[in-house]
Amino acid sequence: ITPQMRPVFHLTPRVGWMNDPNGFSYYNGAYHMFYQYYPYRPFWGPMHWGHAVSKDLLHWNYLPAALAPDEPYENGGGCFSGSAIDLADGRQLLVYTGVLSEKQPDGTMHDVQQQCVAVGDGVNYEKCENNPVMTAKQLPSDSNRFDFRDPKVWKAADGSYRCVMVNCDNKGDGRAVLFESKDGFSWNFKAEVAVLLEEAVVD
């Protein structure tokens, strides 16, 4: 985009393609905006997390991509949407959906969605060695492994962490599922917190 055509009040990437905002947060004295990003061409590609910071939400400085799809558990398309939160030790935790392309019993390949984490200092981020930290294997037995994404993380009053994600059962009915963690790295399934019944769907 030429300087004359670039939006003033909307964040745009320096190059490439962008989509969903992710992990919007205030950390270490600045606003952090991450976003779905493919830096190599101006259209969809393996998803990265772009990263920009601002003091006033108007003037943005671009930082290196916070996440890039460089692990086997992201080989099905990249590092997809998620959120961010401060840890007790001062680091920032990114929680995101990693997509794994996996061979199924019938021989076909299918993208399996799972949740991963990375930690950093506001500029550089390192993925956790025990990723993925939340998988569909932890969900109820009727859960669809291919629709389990978009983690939203927050800190509970007792200092532990909660994370809610979207999922659906094997019939395709949507629901939200809740996980909990004491440290942000080891997660356990807690409950289904919302179920979208067929009669509640509005066309």
Where are the regions a protein language model picked out?
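Beta-rich carbohydrate-recognition and catalytic domains
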Residues: I1-D150, K155-D203
